[in-house]
Amino acid sequence: MSETTGDRLRTWRAGPRLGVAYYNEYLPDPGRLADDLSLMHDAGITCIRIGESVWSKWEPSDGRFALDWLTPVLDGAAEHGIDVILGTPTYAVPRWLSRKHPELAVIRRDGHAVPWGGRQEVDYTSELFREYAERVWRAD
């Protein structure tokens, strides 16, 4: 299977892949990243999934995007022949968003709002949530 992105042609490996979720953003040490990617390559890992659940890392404050942390992971994976699935970070909203819009919280059956700090604590059907989510999806 191939796809064209810009002026580059990307060919995907045929057949099943062995992949893992990789959260380098929790321990952002360049030496660890290099070691982890080498170990994954040696173990036959062909794909990593990154980026989800860290909206606060993508957008540390309202409208300010900081995506430079992704570059070493993407470059390192490419150097090791590991494909990347870049997840969207929208199932764990940043604290600034929950403070700015407390109405986005899911309301439990008992009538209380789900507090910030877990995952999936927002109302995904909210138009306002979807506007913020789309904004982070399109960040560059």
Which role does the model predict for each range below?
Residues 7, 33-109:
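Aromatic-lined substrate-binding rim segments of carbohydrate-active enzymes
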Residues 26-42, 133-139:
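Short, acidic/polar
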